């Protein structure tokens, strides 16, 4: 159980930081394409949220979703 708790802590503790890096990169691309930064951030964050929801609710492996 202790080992599982360490893995859970690593994923849940570090995971959001990686999500924020991806959101920032997507938003930067949106700004370079001409979107206002606030809108680009909102779109990128909603994309990340929707993707996470799809991954949880579909039951498919993330690689399957990526390849669709």
Which stretches of residues belong to each language-model region?
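Helical "substrate-binding/catalytic lid" subdomain
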Residues: 4-68
């Amino acid at each position: 159980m202790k080992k599982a708790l360490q893995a859970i802590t690593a994923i849940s503790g570090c995971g959001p930081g990686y999500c924020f890096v991806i959101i920032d990169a997507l938003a930067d691309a949106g700004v370079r394409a001409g979107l206002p930064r606030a809108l680009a951030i909102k779109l990128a964050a909603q994309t990340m949220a929707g993707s996470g929801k799809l991954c949880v609710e579909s039951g498919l492996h993330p690689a399957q979703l990526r390849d669709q």
